[in-house]
Amino acid sequence: MQLCGSSELLTETDLGESQKQLKKKQKNRVAAQRSRQKHTSKADALHQQHESLEKQNHALRKEIQALQTELAGWGRTLHLHERLCRVDCDPCPVLLPSGCPIQAKQPSGQPAPLGYNGCQEQLGLFQTPGSSPRAQHLSPGPCSHESPGLLPSLLPSLAFDPLMVRTPLAQLSPSPVLSASSPSGSSLLGSFSKLDPLIPSPQDQLAPPQPLRQEQPTSGRLASSDSPAALGPECSQNREHLPALPGSSTHWQKSSVAPSPQALMAFPLLSSAKVHF
């Protein structure tokens, strides 16, 4: 009887433990299912994101290939145009027939290019007698206000050069570009215009000297009548028809009259500059 009672107690304890174990197993199964669902949901989201990125990458690759083909086509057309159309980008050539046109395009505040003054100087030196009237208009002729005392000093130095003797006397006058650009040239022209009424012309040098009071109004009239505005285009025609005098420089040097002391006292600029005519 005692053995049977002890066996019954053991079976009751085993049943309780087995039930607890079953409950734990069920809980573990539910937790495992939840974790599996979470992992599967995350994996599905990552897979969908990866597929979308692959689609975008494929579209971008197609666009890159299209742009590369277009770039290659533009490069070929550019290469063909460079062979056909060659453009020279020189700022200013050495010799120009009718002046440098780049100077007109330059703004007023910026300086002129380096080759512009050289173009104007070479146009003034290498001008032939039969040149265009536009080129002759650039350099003022002997009809303008120019002191005749400067020509005898320039002609002996140029008489030994055969190239410079062939150039007309109009080219020996100062260039308007140099006189306008350099302040020294403008000051010299101003002083020459002041001395112009006192210096006798070549026609007056051949005549006997007259008193100073009578010579000033006549020289002023001659200076006003010899201006290019008064003479007009006839001055250039008469200059071409006049014969060239071979001994004009020596004749002017011999026939030049020294200024009177009254003129030197009246104008101290002449005495200080020591100008000899």
UniProtKB/Swiss-Prot annotation:
Gene Ontology annotations for the cellular component aspect, listed alphabetically: RNA polymerase II transcription regulator complex
Region (Leucine-zipper) residue spans: 46-67
Biased composition (Polar residues): 213-227, 247-256
This protein's UniProt keywords: Activator, Differentiation, DNA-binding, Nucleus, Transcription, Transcription regulation
This protein's record includes keyword Transcription regulation: yes
Conditions for induction: By cytokines in response to infection. By IFN-gamma.
Recorded GO MF terms: DNA binding; DNA-binding transcription factor activity
Observed effect of gene inactivation: Mice display normal development of natural killer (NK), T- and B-cells, plasmacytoid dendritic cells (pDCs), neutrophils, resting CD8-alpha(+) classical dendritic cells (cDCs), and peritoneal, liver and lung macrophages. However, they show significantly decreased survival after infection by T.gondii. Notably, mice show significantly decreased numbers of lung-resident CD103(+)CD11b(-) dendritic cells and CD103(+)CD11b(-) macrophages after infection.
Location(s), subcellular: Nucleus
Any one Gene Ontology BP term: regulation of transcription by RNA polymerase II
Stretch list, region Disordered: 15-50, 126-146, 191-256
Biased composition (Basic and acidic residues): 41-50
Chain ranges of the bZIP domain: 18-81
Top-level taxon: Eukaryota
Subunit relationships: Heterodimer; heterodimerizes with JUN family proteins.
Family: Belongs to the bZIP family.
Stated role: AP-1 family transcription factor that controls the differentiation of lineage-specific cells in the immune system. Selectively suppresses CCN1 transcription and hence blocks the downstream cell proliferation signals produced by CCN1 and inhibits CCN1-induced anchorage-independent growth and invasion in several cancer types. Possibly acts by interfering with AP-1 binding to CCN1 promoter. Following infection, participates in the differentiation of CD8(+) thymic conventional dendritic cells in the immune system.
Protein name: Basic leucine zipper transcriptional factor ATF-like 2
Lineage: Eukaryota, Metazoa, Chordata, Craniata, Vertebrata
Name of the encoding gene: Batf2
